[in-house]
Amino acid sequence: MGSYISVCCWRRHSIKDVHGNDINIAEDFEAFSEGEALLTEKTPTPPLPVYNDNFEDDE
């Protein structure tokens, strides 16, 4: 419910910096958004290392 209220308030009130200037989130935080290439890029996963936790075999 808190998230819903936060989104509603965000749409009605602009975000301001400490000097009272409006902040355009779409422009200022564009560098932090993920590109489509990153989301569709497929890389092979490396094999997992084999761990042996059986200490009785170690002598």
Curated annotation (Swiss-Prot):
Q: How does it sit in the membrane?
A: Lipid-anchor
- A Pfam match is Herpesvir_UL11
Q: How is it modified after translation?
A: Myristoylation and palmitoylation (probably on one or more of the nearby cysteines at the N-terminus) enable membrane-binding and Golgi apparatus-specific targeting and are essential for efficient packaging.
Which cystines does this chain contain? none
The Gene Ontology CC terms held by the record are: host cell Golgi membrane; host cell plasma membrane; membrane; viral tegument; virion membrane
* InterPro entries given in the database record: Herpesvirus_CEP3 (IPR024360)
Say where the lipid (N-myristoyl glycine) is covalently attached.
G2
- Per the record, the coiled-coil ranges are none
What are the subcellular locations of this protein?
Virion tegument; Virion membrane; Host cell membrane; Host Golgi apparatus membrane
The protein's UniProt keywords, in alphabetical order, are: Host cell membrane, Host Golgi apparatus, Host membrane, Lipoprotein, Membrane, Myristate, Palmitate, Phosphoprotein, Virion, Virion tegument
A GO biological-process term:
viral budding from Golgi membrane
Region spans: Disordered: 40-59
Phosphoprotein: present as a keyword of the record?
yes
Q: Does the keyword Lipoprotein apply?
A: yes
Provide the function of this protein: Plays an important role in the cytoplasmic envelopment of tegument proteins and capsids during the assembly and egress processes. Also participates in viral entry at the fusion step probably by regulating the core fusion machinery.
Give the family, as the similarity comment puts it.
Answer: Belongs to the herpesviridae cytoplasmic envelopment protein 3 family.
Assembly notes: Interacts with cytoplasmic envelopment protein 2; this interaction is essential for the proper localization of each protein to the assembly complex and thus for the production of infectious virus.
Matching HAMAP family: HSV_CEP3_gammahv
What is the protein name given in its UniProt record? Cytoplasmic envelopment protein 3
Species of origin: Alcelaphine herpesvirus 1 (strain C500) (AlHV-1)
Task: Give the classification, highest ranks.
Answer: Viruses, Duplodnaviria, Heunggongvirae, Peploviricota, Herviviricetes
